[in-house]
A protein has these predicted regions:
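Classical Sec-dependent N-terminal signal peptides that target proteins to the secretory pathway
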Residues: 1-11
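OB-fold and OB-like single-stranded nucleic-acid-recognition modules
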Residues: 9-203
Length: 203
C-alpha cells in the first residue's frame, strides 16, 4: 500500500472491504473502544442512574487517554463524508476555512464541527484557508479514502468555561443507542473534533 499525492491517478480502495486491511492497530483499538462504549453507555442509560452514566463516560475518556497520548493519532485510513467552506464573517479566525468530516470503519466521524455556544454558532477544528492541508483536502471527493493524522480537541480547549477534559464531540443520545444498527448511526452519530495535521489521498 503506497501513498501518493492527491493529484496522482492510481487505483485505491473504493470501499471498506478494500480499506480494512490498511487500518492501523491504533485505529482498530479506537473502534474497539467505541463499540464497547456504545454497549456500556446503553446499559447505563437503561439503568436511569446518572452516576453509572458519568462513570462510563469517564472510563471511556481514560481509555482514550491511554490509547492516544495527548490526543494524537497517526496514519488513519478514513472515508471523506463532506467538505464545506466556512462562512463566518463574524469570526475571522475561521472564515474561509475548510470544514472536513471523515468517517472511520466503525461509523465514528472525526474532523471539523460547529456548536452553539451562548447562542452563537462556533466552528472548531477547521482546516486553515490556503494551508497545505487545505490544498490537499480541496482535491478530494465525498466517498474517497484518505490517510490522515491529527489531534483530538478537548472540550475545555474549545469551550474554556467547561471544566471537563473529555474530547469535544457531538454526543451519542439514547435515541442513537437504540438505533445503533440503523443507517443513521452507521453514518456517524458521534463526531470528534480533530485538528488535521496531515492528509493524503489513499491511492
Amino acid at each position: 500500500f503506497t501513498l501518493f499525492s492527491c493529484s496522482t491517478v492510481t487505483a485505491g480502495p473504493v470501499n471498506w472491504e478494500g480499506a480494512e486491511k490498511y487500518i492501523t492497530i491504533q485505529q482498530k483499538q479506537f473502534c474497539d473502544l467505541k463499540n464497547n462504549h456504545v454497549l456500556n453507555l446503553y446499559n447505563a442509560i437503561e439503568s436511569r442512574n446518572e452516576i453509572k452514566i458519568n462513570k462510563v463516560k469517564k472510563q471511556r475518556q481514560e481509555d482514550l487517554d491511554a490509547l492516544l497520548p495527548s490526543g494524537t493519532f497517526e496514519n488513519w485510513i478514513v472515508k471523506l463524508v463532506s467538505i464545506k467552506q466556512v462562512n463566518s464573517p463574524q469570526d475571522q479566525t475561521t472564515d474561509g476555512d475548510s470544514a472536513a468530516v471523515f468517517e472511520l470503519s466503525c461509523g465514528t466521524q472525526i474532523g471539523s464541527g460547529s456548536f452553539l455556544i451562548d447562542g452563537k454558532l462556533t466552528w472548531g477544528a477547521t482546516i486553515k484557508f490556503n494551508s497545505r492541508q487545505y490544498r490537499e483536502v480541496s482535491k478530494l471527493s465525498s466517498g474517497q479514502f484518505a490517510i490522515i493524522s491529527g489531534t483530538f480537541l478537548k472540550l475545555n480547549d474549545f469551550v474554556p468555561s467547561k471544566k471537563e477534559t473529555f474530547y469535544a464531540s457531538r454526543p451519542l443520545t439514547s435515541g442513537d443507542l437504540q438505533n445503533d444498527k440503523n443507517d443513521r448511526y452507521s453514518n456517524g452519530d458521534e463526531l470528534f473534533l480533530s485538528y488535521i495535521t496531515y492528509i493524503a489521498a489513499a491511492n
